[in-house]
Curated annotation (Swiss-Prot):
Gene3D superfamilies: 2.60.40.790. Pfam families: Crystallin (PF00525), HSP20 (PF00011). It comes from Rana temporaria (European common frog). Belongs to the small heat shock protein (HSP20) family. Coiled coil: none annotated. It comes from the Eukaryota. Residues 125-149 are annotated as: Disordered. Glycans are attached at S138. Contributes to the transparency and refractive index of the lens. May act as a chaperone, preventing aggregation of various proteins under a wide range of stress conditions. This is Alpha-crystallin A chain. Zn(2+) 1 binds at H55, H76, E78, H83, H91. GO terms for biological process: lens development in camera-type eye; negative regulation of apoptotic process; protein refolding; response to heat.
Length: 149
């Protein structure tokens, strides 16, 4: 899921990519966070989602809780880049733990484009409220280190 990253010589001429093997592809060796995969951690005390949204600003993102789910939506209008014009949009939906303290949830966007949605868990399993609630996205100045696998 690497959209809008442009094409490279090895994308157009894969037979010129490697002397190691004709089947070797540089594009397959991209880092974890460049893959578009999110990281969800749920331990005893905390629930956290890390998502690479480097092509979006906080104004392009909407994060809201709807019943027992968090919905993350990103969309930006058509922009010019090095390779032409591009627009991007995504939707992600994650089920929240029943014991998540929804009143203490935070959401921030790091300088390197990692969106972190996080909240503490309560000791008792209280019934979550079934309503829609927006979660503001704050901007951080420091980059987020890559999540551990």
């Amino acid at each position: 899921q690497v959209f809008g990253e442009g094409m490279f010589d090895y994308d157009l001429f894969p037979f010129l990519t490697s002397t190691v093997s004709p089947h070797y592809r540089h594009g397959l060796l991209r880092g974890f966070m460049d893959s578009g995969i999110s990281e969800v951690r749920s331990d005893r005390d905390r629930f956290t989602i890390n998502l690479d949204v480097k092509h979006f600003s906080p104004d392009d993102l909407t994060v809201k809780i709807l019943d027992d789910f968090v919905e993350i939506h990103g969309k930006h209008s058509e922009r010019q880049d090095d390779h032409g014009y591009i627009s991007r949009e995504f939707h992600r939906r994650y089920r929240l733990p029943s014991n998540l303290d929804q009143s203490s949830i935070s959401c921030s966007l790091s300088a390197d484009g990692i969106l972190t949605f996080s909240g503490p868990k309560m000791m008792s399993n209280l019934v979550s409220s079934h309503s829609e609630r927006p979660i503001p996205v704050s901007r951080e100045e420091k980059p987020t280190s890559a999540p551990s696998s």
